[in-house]
UniProtKB/Swiss-Prot annotation:
It is found in: Mitochondrion inner membrane. Its main location: mitochondrion. One of its GO terms (cellular component) is mitochondrial inner membrane. It comes from Pongo abelii (Sumatran orangutan). Belongs to the mitochondrial carrier (TC 2.A.29) family. It catalyses: 2-oxoadipate(in) + 2-oxoglutarate(out) = 2-oxoadipate(out) + 2-oxoglutarate(in); hexanedioate(in) + 2-oxoglutarate(out) = hexanedioate(out) + 2-oxoglutarate(in); L-2-aminoadipate(in) + 2-oxoglutarate(out) = L-2-aminoadipate(out) + 2-oxoglutarate(in); glutarate(in) + 2-oxoglutarate(out) = glutarate(out) + 2-oxoglutarate(in). The gene is SLC25A21. This is Mitochondrial 2-oxodicarboxylate carrier. The keyword Ligase does not apply. It is a multi-pass membrane protein. It comes from the Eukaryota. One of its GO terms (biological process) is lipid transport. One of its GO terms (molecular function) is antiporter activity. Keywords: Antiport, Lipid transport, Membrane, Mitochondrion, Mitochondrion inner membrane, Repeat, Transmembrane, Transmembrane helix, Transport. Pfam families: Mito_carr.
Length: 299
């Protein structure tokens, strides 16, 4: 009798891993070029720098001219490798936190929001080492052929700085803030608004309903969490003076950026981030939901 719930849980987790991995892979392949542009904007510090990008269009033009097409896919391997466990953690833990919060007298709106926060914090712990490698590779402006491999770069970090908070887990507090805040808003907004708007019987209109809510969820979450994202990129990216660590902790980095560069510097890369995580967030939710629904019917 006790074996049935265990089998059910294993099957449910397996479905979420497959559906979440599919959602992550599709989103990464479609949206990664915008992530490269976003990271480049966030790590540049001075408009007078001859290597700085003047606009979104200018960044695309310069990257293509100097690094060619593959320049837009720098650092793509770490997020691809991380997507299956990351999305599995994201969606599976969200459901588990939601079930756990069901034992507490909370409103559905608060339940979705807190469950999203919990899933984001858990996700951040899993994904942070991959983010450290990804940001380092994206910050490299050499041609694709001249940059180190993903594994080679990870080995360099481990050899020089180790596995800890100065090495492969550098910027963990900022990553916790970035993912915790994003998932809190992303899941909280999506499921609350989706439950408020009636389901449409027409499949096309229903698809558009979900896509529109997902688009808004990703956009709003991106606007709210981007200061954490900027702090993460500064901590994990190249430091202004080689060998001297300027950016260490999340909130101290935010304060330094604000004092030296102004409030708008905390929103660097917002446009490419919204362009990526607005539609990307919608794509991810829809791919996950439709894949998971198909797996429920066929497996």
């Amino acid at each position: 009798m006790s074996a049935k719930p265990e089998v059910g849980l294993v099957r449910e987790a397996s479905r979420q891993i497959v559906a979440g991995g599919s959602a992550g892979l599709v989103e990464i392949c479609l949206m990664h070029p915008l992530d490269v542009v976003k990271t480049r904007f966030q790590i540049q510090r001075c408009a007078t720098d001859p290597n700085s990008y003047k606009s979104l269009v200018d960044s695309f033009r310069m990257i293509f001219q100097t690094e060619r097409l593959f320049g837009f896919y720098k650092g793509i391997l770490p997020p691809i490798l991380a997507e299956t466990p990351k999305r599995a953690v994201k969606f599976f833990t969200f459901e588990q936190y939601k079930k756990l919060l069901g034992y507490v007298s909370l409103s559905p709106a608060l339940t979705f929001t807190i469950a999203g926060l919990g899933s984001g914090l858990t996700e951040a712990i899993v994904v942070n080492p991959f983010e450290v490698v990804k940001v380092g590779l994206q910050a490299n402006r050499n041609t694709f052929a001249k940059q180190p491999s993903t594994v080679g770069y990870a080995r360099q970090i481990i050899k020089k700085e180790g596995w800890g908070l100065q090495g492969l887990n550098k910027g963990l507090t900022a990553t916790l803030g970035r993912h915790g805040v994003f998932n809190m808003v992303y899941f909280g907004f999506y499921y609350n608004v989706k439950n408020m708007i009636p389901v449409n019987k027409d499949p096309t209109l229903e698809f558009l309903r979900k896509f529109g809510i997902g688009l808004l969820s990703g956009t709003i979450a991106s606007v709210i969490n981007i200061p954490f994202d900027v702090a993460k990129s500064r901590i994990q990216g190249p430091q202004p003076v080689p060998g001297e660590i300027k950016y260490r902790t999340c909130f101290k980095t935010m304060a330094t950026v604000y004092q030296e560069e102004g409030i708008l510097a905390l929103y660097k890369g917002l446009l490419p981030k919204i362009m990526r995580l607005g539609p990307g967030g919608a794509v991810m939710l829809l791919v996950y939901e439709y894949t998971y629904s198909w797996l429920q019917e066929n497996w």
